Amino acid sequence: AWIDCPELGIHPGDAKYGVLADKDGVMFPCMETIHMPYIQEKKLPSVSLRPPSSGQLAYGVRTRDLEAPMQLIELLSGAVSEFLPGIVSISTPNDWSFCVRFSNDCQATFSHYGLERQVDKLEQALEHARQTHRKINAINLIPEHNVPVLFDGAYEDIPLAEPIEE
């Protein structure tokens, strides 16, 4: 994933001064000639970080703020489902949650713990929205029950064609 930290001048997709993170949450500087040919074809999500108190990002060591977002990226990259869209960006507004923006413009709030349960809830909600011809604008996946969902009121979906059995 790309790291986004505008306060430190780090922006996603910057081949010269960009920073990448691996699946374990270890950051490293982007090396244009080495990394760009491999990642140019992939649409890597970006993870926004608040600037550390030291004023510098730590390379080569596991970063706690990246652990859950990178675990979620890994979980969703292995999920095969027609309902799960791709991750565009992840932001961390506070210490107990992070927000994910998906390619279908849905925004989901996750807790750092119980990601598998939250991904299951997201998949169920997206499937239900599709079956009822609605689009989810925002969903908070932190509660275990009664997950709050905000639907797009302006969204018009053409009903799905249902096969007729003869």
Task: Indicate residue ranges for each PLM-predicted region.
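Charged, solvent-exposed interaction patches on well-folded alpha/beta domains
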Residues: 1-166
